[in-house]
Regions:
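Extracellular interaction modules
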Residues: 16-38, 104-108, 228-232
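Feature responds to low-complexity, polar/acidic, surface-exposed segments characteristic
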Residues: 37-106, 115-135, 143-165, 177-192, ...
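Extracellular/surface recognition and adhesion modules
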Residues: 8-11, 34, 112, 170
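Surface-exposed interfaces of beta-sheet-rich extracellular modules
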Residues: 1-22
């Protein structure tokens, strides 16, 4: 089971969640109870400051259904690091032959590799311009977490996959979901909308409805209200102050100036 903003802790025999079940023998109808706890933000990531981490293109589009490259993914998570973590691990030496010193993504890839969060295609290549897969993206998210997966995955297509344990952990934390038919599609490229949705879950950046946003925010002609990804895109592309709305959701309280990330692209 998946619940946005929560980690699944297991099945229990009682409503007070004191008797955890590992196996159950069905001889009659039984009621079991799902255990949940709010998922915290990983220690290396900045979940407190809700700044824009996605930038649209020069034509004014955010391209929610386009793929995300491996370099772009490294840059996104580089921006989302806590400042002290980013400065401690900051480097422009990646060890990858295809990540050139003058490339705009060099510091991002190099720093994230130094953290052990991103991996190469081979020992000495990163393939920065290749579209990142759903499995690769889930694995990056899971590497920020220090826990281990508990129980079997509900996905039908990840058994034996190189990222099976990372996918299972990301699912347990409520960060990723599969198709209605139970597939995760690990080798399919992830879209920008899917990536933003997952990142917002990782960071607990979750407006519940359009009324939680503010007038005057940046909006996009290719991410209109009514699209399943509308809230995720708005959250990812607008810097804002916020107030908590219950245990998981948020309500914006002010719009802020977006950070200038160009200093790390030189």
């Amino acid at each position: 089971p998946v619940r946005e903003g929560y980690t699944f802790t297991g099945w229990y025999a009682d409503k007070d969640l004191t008797e955890k079940i590992s196996t159950i023998k069905m001889t009659s109808n039984k009621t079991v109870y799902a255990g949940w706890e709010a998922t915290g933000v990983p220690d290396w990531l900045n979940g407190a400051d809700h700044f824009a981490y996605i930038i649209g293109d020069d034509e004014g589009y955010v391209r929610p259904l386009a793929n995300v490259t491996r370099a772009e993914t490294a840059a996104i998570f580089f921006r989302l690091l806590k400042e002290d973590v980013r400065e401690e691990y900051l480097t422009d030496r990646s060890g990858f032959a295809d990540v050139e010193q003058g490339a705009w993504y060099n510091k991002a890839v190099s720093t994230m590799a130094a953290l052990g969060v991103v991996k190469g295609y081979t020992e000495d290549t990163f393939a920065p311009h290749e579209a990142i897969t759903r499995a690769e993206f889930a694995a990056i998210c899971a590497r920020f977490d220090t826990g281990t997966s508990d129980g079997e995955s509900s996905f039908t297509d990840i058994s034996g996959h190189w990222a099976e344990s990372e996918i299972r952990r990301a699912a347990q934390l409520g960060w990723i979901q599969g198709d209605p038919d139970g597939r995760f599609r690990p080798n399919a490229p992830i879209t920008r909308a899917e990536a933003m949705t997952i990142i917002n879950r990782v960071l607990n950046r979750l407006p519940e409805e359009k009324e939680d946003l503010l007038e005057g925010m940046k909006e996009w002609p290719d991410a209109l209200p009514g699209a399943w990804y509308y809230l995720a895109v708005q959250e990812a592309t607008n810097s804002h102050a916020y107030e908590r709305k219950g245990e998981v959701y948020e309500r914006w309280s002010a719009l802020n100036v977006n950070p200038d990330w160009a200093q790390y692209q030189r």
